[in-house]
Swiss-Prot record:
GO terms for molecular function: rRNA (cytosine-N4-)-methyltransferase activity. Specifically methylates the N4 position of cytidine in position 1402 (C1402) of 16S rRNA. It is found in: Cytoplasm. This is Ribosomal RNA small subunit methyltransferase H.
Length: 364
């Protein structure tokens, strides 16, 4: 079954990678300041789409690249990879990797690529994944409680909920869903699974709905819990941290990073990474160093873009989207590389911290 997918912020994302004078709100480039040599980059550059999905952003970028350019696309989703391979079969510039963007550095190195001209990431869940009940992402459609981006490996949400403690569930839901009723939700899930296994999305949604005492306007009470479980089961924030670090390591001078995020946890990580790399001297402000001894910016922020009213009217998913863009300077990488500018989340497999006395989920 085919599901429609409309890429969010399509034109500004591609513009961010190819236009030398691109600048969104808050861009640090001054008017008239020259950008990178766009003609050379478009004809011979190497670009990365870390979240191929159904290929909307990739196709739009390919339409503006030259015949000698290369585009390496990544995705965990087997259905997305099938679409990507069809595209690659008809366009020799495209190379396909079945894997997440966290493996970007290793996969590019294996292909002899040491430097790239652009990296784009469209974070979150695609419309086809949400609309397909069998994937288990939606609390509005009944389906298996799965939520894996890559359905060929790893535990499902149902697997994890069947064995997680109340404390583990509480912390995941509080940290990754920013749910203030996380403790109540965790206890409700434990009570529900004691009477019958939780195998479907609607079972979980009904269980959670009874524990969330107030509703945010226009938001289903299970929204934050589903978000938290999806992020946790796919290790989304840990993988984003690795991808951002790899992008800083791989981008050549003038290369661009364009990231679309859909919730505050992702956007905060992207924003903080760009800010840290653009203003590394801030971390040394209290040290008795001469200006010449301070670290120089690794990137220049090119600002952010949000969807206009026209796009939001035609695609509700665009309402929460934020595109942030950065341009690599010619400054050499510091010891430790790009990882030093990224605040990583939970390490995959790290034990969940226990509940503090009296804690019932934290407000954020």
């Amino acid at each position: 079954m085919e599901f429609e997918h409309r890429p969010v912020l399509l034109e500004p994302t591609v513009d961010a990678l190819v236009l030398p004078d691109f600048g969104g709100k808050g861009a640090h480039r001054q008017a008239g300041e020259p950008g990178p040599d766009a003609a050379t980059r478009l004809q011979h550059g190497v670009f990365v789409d870390g979240t191929f999905g159904r290929g909307g952003h990739s196709r739009a970028l390919l339409a503006r690249l030259g015949a000698q350019a290369r585009l390496v696309v990544f995705d965990k989703d087997p259905q997305a990879i099938a679409v990507a391979r069809e595209l690659a079969a008809g366009d020799g510039r495209v190379e396909v990797v079945h894997g997440g963007f966290a493996t970007m550095a290793e996969e590019l190195t294996a292909r002899g690529i040491e430097q790239v001209d652009g990296v784009m990431l469209d974070l979150g869940v695609s419309s086809p994944q949400i609309d397909d009940a069998e994937r288990g992402f939606s609390f509005m459609r009944d389906g298996p409680l799965d939520m894996r981006m890559d359905t060929t490996r790893g535990p499902t949400v149902a697997d994890w909920l069947a064995q997680a403690s109340v404390d583990e569930m509480r912390e995941v839901i509080a940290d990754y869903g920013e749910e203030r009723f996380a403790f109540q939700v965790a206890k409700a899930i434990a009570a529900c699974r004691a009477t019958r296994p939780l195998h479907t999305t609607l079972q979980l949604a009904e269980c959670v709905a009874g524990a969330v005492r107030t509703r945010e306007k226009g938001q289903h009470p299970a929204t934050r819990t589903f978000q938290a479980l999806r992020i946790y089961i796919n290790r989304e924030l840990e993988e984003l941290a690795r991808a951002l670090a790899s992008a800083l390591d791989l981008l050549g001078p003038g290369g661009r990073l364009a990231v679309i995020s859909f919730h505050s946890l992702e956007d905060r990580m992207v924003k903080q990474c760009i800010a840290a790399a653009a203003r590394p001297a801030a971390a040394h402000a209290r040290l008795p160093l001469r200006e010449s001894e301070l670290p120089q910016p690794l990137v220049r922020s090119l600002g952010k873009v949000v969807a206009d009213d026209v796009e939001v009217a035609g695609n509700a998913r665009a309402r929460s989207a934020i595109l942030r863009v950065a341009e690599r300077t010619g400054e050499p990488l510091p010891p430790g590389g790009g990882a030093g500018f990224v605040k990583a989340g939970r390490v995959p497999g790290e034990p969940v911290r226990g509940t503090r006395a009296g804690s019932k989920g934290r407000r954020r």
